[in-house]
């Protein structure tokens, strides 16, 4: 009995005009995810996945490269306007927003969604180097 060839389904590129850029900037890495208004991920990129390893992942330039890679993928969807949500204290916060702006997106608003505990969990002990 002959096997039927498995056909790879072609992803239909839907047209999205408005999107949300979620930037997670930690001290060690920066993750950029661009979604539509409903929260469905269109593209994502990280500083580590962009070819930076070790301490170079936590640089503003690595975050900028990750944002540029993400913007490149999302251009195919016809995205024009971006709402930016930044989470975390990392060094890639500002450079990521600048890179998205330079990529040609109109940034409608920037929101800081860093979680701040109301005296929740005990923080880790201070480093002694």
Curated annotation (Swiss-Prot):
Gene that specifies this protein: rpsK
This molecule's function is given as: Located on the platform of the 30S subunit, it bridges several disparate RNA helices of the 16S rRNA. Forms part of the Shine-Dalgarno cleft in the 70S ribosome.
- Gene Ontology terms, MF aspect: rRNA binding; structural constituent of ribosome
Which is a Gene Ontology cellular component entry for this protein?
Answer: ribosome
Q: One biological-process term from Gene Ontology?
A: translation
**Entry protein name:** Small ribosomal subunit protein uS11
Q: Does the keyword Translocase apply?
A: no
Task: Please indicate which superkingdom the organism of origin belongs to.
Answer: Bacteria
